[in-house]
């Protein structure tokens, strides 16, 4: 009997909601990336998008350990010569808190077509409200050690 290989349409996708209040950014990102890829499922296949949808709320209340707020930078480039811009993570958290969380999670996903497809299942919101109540998301709690 041949080995069972799941196809993209074979998986049932769940919706998870993660509250980012006082959760360390890297721990949140690795947990969300695991759910998005489907690595928590017994039918995980690296070349198939079998993951779940993830909603992250309260992105503006994320915790960043150490002195990363002032010493870690987020870079972006306009595409023109001399168009490299950098901001500290603290500045970016004030203006666009969702972008900090999105970049951390996307950095832990594959950097190819499959990764871009998986990114579409990530929804990040700065406040406690989200428009996905109809999907009945399951609360996902990140267990963390005391800081």
UniProtKB/Swiss-Prot annotation:
Keywords: Ribonucleoprotein, Ribosomal protein. It comes from the Bacteria. CDD domains: Ribosomal_L13. Pfam families: Ribosomal_L13 (PF00572). NCBIfam families: rplM_bact. Belongs to the universal ribosomal protein uL13 family. This is Large ribosomal subunit protein uL13. The gene is rplM.
């Amino acid at each position: 009997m041949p080995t069972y290989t799941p196809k993209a349409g074979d998986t049932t996708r769940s919706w998870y909601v993660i509250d980012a209040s006082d959760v360390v950014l890297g721990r949140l990102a690795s947990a969300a990336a695991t759910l998005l890829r489907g690595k928590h499922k017994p039918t995980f296949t690296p070349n198939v998008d079998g993951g779940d949808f993830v909603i992250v709320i309260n992105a503006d209340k994320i915790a960043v350990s150490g002195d990363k707020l002032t010493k870690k930078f987020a870079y972006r480039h306009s595409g023109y010569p001399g168009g490299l811009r950098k901001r500290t993570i603290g500045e970016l958290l004030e203006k666009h808190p969702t972008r900090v969380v999105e970049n951390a999670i996307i950095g832990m996903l594959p950097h190819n077509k499959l990764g871009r497809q998986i990114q579409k299942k990530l929804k990040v919101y700065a406040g406690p409200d989200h428009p996905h109540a109809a999907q009945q998301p399951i609360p996902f709690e990140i267990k963390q050690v005391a800081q």
